[in-house]
UniProtKB/Swiss-Prot annotation:
It is a peripheral membrane protein. Its main location: membrane. This is ATP synthase subunit delta. GO terms for molecular function: proton-transporting ATP synthase activity, rotational mechanism. GO terms for cellular component: plasma membrane; proton-transporting ATP synthase complex. The gene is atpH. F(1)F(0) ATP synthase produces ATP from ADP in the presence of a proton or sodium gradient. F-type ATPases consist of two structural domains, F(1) containing the extramembraneous catalytic core and F(0) containing the membrane proton channel, linked together by a central stalk and a peripheral stalk. During catalysis, ATP synthesis in the catalytic domain of F(1) is coupled via a rotary mechanism of the central stalk subunits to proton translocation. Keywords: ATP synthesis, Cell inner membrane, Cell membrane, CF(1), Hydrogen ion transport, Ion transport, Membrane, Transport. Belongs to the ATPase delta chain family. F-type ATPases have 2 components, F(1) - the catalytic core - and F(0) - the membrane proton channel. F(1) has five subunits: alpha(3), beta(3), gamma(1), delta(1), epsilon(1). F(0) has three main subunits: a(1), b(2) and c(10-14). The alpha and beta chains form an alternating ring which encloses part of the gamma chain. F(1) is attached to F(0) by a central stalk formed by the gamma and epsilon chains, while a peripheral stalk is formed by the delta and b chains. InterPro entries: ATP_synth_OSCP/delta_N_sf (IPR026015), ATPase_OSCP/d_CS (IPR020781), ATPase_OSCP/dsu (IPR000711). It is found in: Cell inner membrane.
Length: 181
């Protein structure tokens, strides 16, 4: 459940279209996965990719990343573009948006099942099967436990939300009372 910056989404779309055109989507996805791990490592060190790129060391960051992770030419040139446009800070969001582009292209929707306790795999599969038939797409569901909903479930995917929780029912009831009185 990420709220992404429009700049990140735009860059991800551009990268995805080029990867499709060159038929290297899986390689670019693999490169971005490696870069994501590198960014996580930097975050633990309280550093950012942008900061390292600005350092006046003799090493070229993009060449280092390319040789260390074996990046393909598209990913390498894309990183150079981000560096040139001072957009390296968006890389983690671009990776998330790129993954969303790939899932959409493959006909996969990511969803969240919010419940008060962890559901069994078979119960999740039942919900998943119902919504896959409704959406006519493959659905990947993550079960999130949130005791604040009191009871029931909330299912979120794309821009949709089915709130069948007790808290949701109480809030809808409150709204109706306020409208009528």
């Amino acid at each position: 459940m990420h709220k992404l910056n429009n700049v990140a989404v735009l860059y991800a779309k551009i990268l995805f279209k080029q990867a499709i055109k060159l038929n290297i989507v899986s390689k670019v996805k693999q490169d971005l996965k490696a870069l994501k791990q590198f960014c996580k490592f930097l975050a633990k060190q309280n550093m950012s990719l942008q900061l390292i790129a600005l350092m006046k060391n003799k090493i070229n960051l993009m060449d280092y990343l390319s040789s260390t992770y074996g990046l393909n030419h598209l990913t390498y040139n894309f990183l150079k573009l981000l560096q040139k446009n001072n957009r390296l800070t968006y890389l983690s969001h671009i990776i998330i948006a790129f993954d969303a582009q790939v899932r959409n292209y493959q006909g996969v929707t990511l969803g969240y099942l919010i419940t008060t306790k962890k559901w069994s795999k078979s119960a999740i599969k039942e919900i998943k099967d119902i919504f896959e038939r409704k959406l006519n797409r493959k659905l990947i569901i993550s079960n999130i436990v949130d005791k604040s909903i009191v009871g029931g479930i909330i299912l979120r995917y794309e821009d949709y939300e089915y709130d069948l929780s007790m808290l949701g029912a109480i809030n809808r009831f409150k709204s109706r009372i306020k409208l009528n009185y």
